């Protein structure tokens, strides 16, 4: 999102992606 909280939104998105990527890595294995 745009605005003063963009860094917070990016951090939250990054955390969500880490969770998704971790799950995908497990499936993948």
UniProtKB/Swiss-Prot annotation:
GO CC terms for this protein? Answer: extracellular region
The domain of life is Eukaryota
Query: Where the protein is mainly located, per its record?
Result: secreted
Q: Does the keyword Transport apply?
A: yes
Q: Where in the cell is it found?
A: Secreted
Q: Which residues form a coiled coil?
A: none
Q: Which UniProt keywords apply?
A: Allergen, Secreted, Transport
Report the sequence similarity comment from the record: Belongs to the calycin superfamily. Lipocalin family.
Q: Can you say what this protein is called?
A: Dander allergen Equ c 2.0101
